[in-house]
Amino acid sequence: MNIRFYNARILVPSEGHSFQVITGELWVKKNEIIYIGDGLDTERVFEKEPAGMILWDREIDAEKNLLLPGFKNAHTHTAMTFLRSYADDLPLQDWLTKQVFPKEALLTADDIYWLSILGIMEYLTSGITSNFDMYFFPETIAKASIDCGFRTMQVSSFNDFTSSIEEMEEIYHKVNEMSDLTGYVPGFHAEYTTSKEHLKQVAALSEKLHAPVYFHNSETALEVEQCKERYGMTPTRLMEELGMFQYGGGGYHCVYFEDEDFEIFRKRNLTAVTNPASNLKLASGIAPIDRFIKEGINLAIGTDGPASNNCLDKIGRAHV
């Protein structure tokens, strides 16, 4: 489909990390933006067309509207749409072990396919055009995204109870070869669901593939406390000691950080993905965003899954 937006205010990137707003037109040909400008320099576009012109399927007067680049949802579990608003009154550990994990054990690949498509439909209503997903049946999730024309990067949810490191490597190659719309990187669910031996395997695979690693990190005070009891250090320090960050990556939530955790993230150029609405629902706490900014650490925002957030609205999460 060929679409022309005109009379629009358009937010476009400029030098550095800044943006500017221009007034003009935005043209979409099939699935590609082919022009953004004031509409006075379109000859260069027409010159590339075989017929010297473009037949529009739709022309939209966008006066008094602002066109924005698509949002990226930096952390989510899309297919958890089936658990939306489920068990709203429990802290994270009870919520996971008593309510979520038993329900997830019943899911099939076909369930994941249709639940993923349902989630993608919701993403599009708030301008989300790509996501960083973590869930089961990654090849099925990739197929759902491809069928919808949606861009999905996935990270492994590897832990002590599902799959193997060999399967993670196999899926890495399969998903990364499926389409330009899909990708996959090594990772694991969290320190508290993954033994030290398995964590070492993830670090070794990251080294072998030269790939970054992502995981749920320091989401609750209990998680950090128990990790210290097991290993005498925070989850971030443990992963650093295991060589997990040689090729970058990051953590989801990052609510309970100590001074050395900030230093490791800064030194390794890691990304802290905040999930404010999810952390509030599960009474986990509030991430120290001001400290991340002060330290110059990469920051991103995710919705988390719809079960721990109750929606997949990126704008609403940024507002929180």
Give, region by region, the residue ranges found by the protein language model.
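N-terminal metal-binding scaffold of metallo-dependent hydrolase/deaminase domains
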Residues: M1-K48
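Active-site-adjacent C-terminal substructures of enzyme catalytic domains
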Residues: T194, M244-H319
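Metal-coordinating catalytic core of metallo-dependent amide/deamination hydrolases
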Residues: T140-V255
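Divalent metal-coordination and catalytic microenvironments
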Residues: A8, L26, N31, K64, ...
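Alpha-helical scaffold segments that flank or form the walls of functional sites
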Residues: R84-G149, E169-M178
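Hydrophobic faces of well-ordered beta-strands that scaffold small-molecule active sites
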Residues: G70-A74, N131-F132, T152-V155, Y184-F188, ...
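Conserved N-terminal beta-strand of ABC nucleotide-binding domains
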Residues: N2, T23-L26, E59, E63, ...
